[in-house]
Amino acid sequence: MKTAHEIRPGNVIMLDGSPWVVQKTETTRSGRNAAIVKMKLKNLLQESSTETTFKGEDKMEDIILDRLDCTYSYFADPMYVFMDAEYNQYDVEADNLGDAAAYIVDGMEEQCQVTFYEGKAISVELPTTVVREVTYTEPSARGDTSGKVMKPATIAGGATLSVADFVKTGDLIEIDTRTHEFKKRA
């Protein structure tokens, strides 16, 4: 058991019978010096998010989830199938992937971390950066441009993001999977 004041982003807590991952915490002190902790939480079983407030001394159960490095194998509607080093396969529901599904493509070589709760694969964490091919973007706009010029692009997997003006269709780019931002040309 930990107090609300000891919980950090990335911890998983049990709340109302469900596991919630802490995405953000903010501690403030009231006039009477009692700490109030505001947390942004994401339900690992239902992919819902909420913001809630706790007193600093409130106790909550901090749980440890099993994580396993896996590679993406294939998609069997509505499940994404991942395989570990011993060739064991784990099914993760498409709804549990959220935005990560747009970065999962056939033949991807990056290792993902599959998270388990009570023996069931419930979510997938992508690497911090992935390299993907630009499948469509408009030609560069030459002329009256100064500074950092961005344009929309679609990548393999279907995600749309802003890329630098010099990126062309067919280029490989590096993307930050946490912020969904273009980092550089690969």
Curated annotation (Swiss-Prot):
Main subcellular location: cytoplasm
GO CC annotation terms, alphabetical: cytoplasm
Keywords of the record: Cytoplasm, Elongation factor, Protein biosynthesis
GO molecular function, one term: translation elongation factor activity
Function: Involved in peptide bond synthesis. Stimulates efficient translation and peptide-bond synthesis on native or reconstituted 70S ribosomes in vitro. Probably functions indirectly by altering the affinity of the ribosome for aminoacyl-tRNA, thus increasing their reactivity as acceptors for peptidyl transferase.
Subcellular location: Cytoplasm
Domain of life: Bacteria
Family, per entry: Belongs to the elongation factor P family.
Keyword check for Transport: no
The protein's name: Elongation factor P
Cited Pfam families: EFP, EFP_N, Elong-fact-P_C
BP GO terms, sorted: peptide biosynthetic process
Cytoplasm is among the record's keywords: yes
InterPro entries (UniProt xref): Elong-fact-P_C, NA-bd_OB-fold, Rib_uL2_dom2, Transl_elong_fac_P/YeiP, Transl_elong_KOW-like, Transl_elong_P/YeiP_cen, Transl_elongation_fac_P, Translation_prot_SH3-like_sf
Pathway annotation: Protein biosynthesis; polypeptide chain elongation
